[in-house]
Regions:
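Short alpha-helical elements
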Residues: 1-276
């Protein structure tokens, strides 16, 4: 399997509950039966992890057209975003998110097909690329992500990236420290963080590399690009589809970390024999 069953089973359990019910409106009931949601879900996970084309993943059980149609249907109903939020809430309840320390950084990946979130990449000889502005907590758990063209600077993406904290409502610590690299070293960034009431640690331009607490976001970016081929080379052209795959990838990452951290703290019937 593309993802171990100990991780994908609890994700599917929550995902299945979010899928809206579909009524059979055919008057005679003699049409082709609807492909099971579980089959489509597993195929989409394969697309995400392996990065293969839909036509390569499709087989006699599910066509590529069904994959795309069901994917768009679930996106319209907000299933992927809701799944990501459920995973975050579960991790926060059982382990606890380190929201007192936040880290933001950008990551540029190839986008050979272009699209709504593609631009000329400054690190790939002007070829099409996509930038992900990622927000993580102090332990590297992905909290939110904003996508834009690769030619977009990191600083303008900081405000919409920090807006992802709104998903927690008022359950935020009184004091938050944001760690940023030298790409955010500007007066506008400091004014923005001062207006939000956040402390900040920003690396200085022209000084030697200062990793500090920022290494966790680099690790999470590596989890995205090395663990999910679809995110390493972005072949989707619509922003909402990219966001859906990022949300699914984040759900897998958070669930894996949750099981890993809970493995030494809790006991449950389906607890894996080895710590993931």
């Amino acid at each position: 399997p593309a993802v171990p069953s100990s991780i994908i089973e609890p994700i599917w359990y929550q995902f299945e509950a979010l899928i809206p019910a579909v009524t059979d409106a055919h008057p005679l009931g003699c049409h082709r039966p609807r492909v099971a949601d579980r089959i489509v879900f597993e195929k989409l996970v394969q697309v995400l992890v392996l990065g293969a084309a839909y036509a390569k993943i499709a087989d006699s059980t599910c066509s590529s057209t069904t994959l795309r149609r069901r994917r768009d249907e679930w996106i319209r109903h907000g299933v992927f975003a809701a799944l990501e939020q459920i995973c975050l809430d579960a991790y926060n309840k059982m382990i606890g998110l380190e929201l007192e320390t936040l880290v933001v950084d950008g990551c540029i990946v190839k986008a050979p097909c272009g699209g709504e979130a593609a631009g000329r990449s400054p690190v790939d000889r002007g070829k099409q690329g996509t930038k992900r502005s990622l927000l993580v907590d102090g332990s590297g758990i992905p909290i939110g992500c904003v996508i834009a063209g690769a030619n977009c600077h990191d600083s303008p993406l900081l405000a919409p990236t920090l807006d992802k904290l709104n998903r927690f409502g008022f359950d935020l610590p009184e004091q938050i420290t944001v760690h940023l690299d030298a790409g955010y070293d500007s007066g506008k960034t400091r004014d923005l963080l001062d207006g939000l009431g956040c402390d900040y640690v920003i690396s200085k331009k022209g000084e030697p590399l200062q990793a500090g607490a920022r290494w966790v976001v680099e690790r999470t970016n590596a989890w995205h690009t090395r663990g999910f081929r679809k995110l390493q080379i972005c072949t989707e052209v619509r922003t909402r589809v990219i966001d859906a795959f990022i949300a699914l990838a984040n759900a897998i990452i958070i669930t894996r970390r949750l099981i890993r951290e809970a493995w030494t703290r809790y006991r449950w019937n389906t607890r894996p024999a080895r710590r993931p």
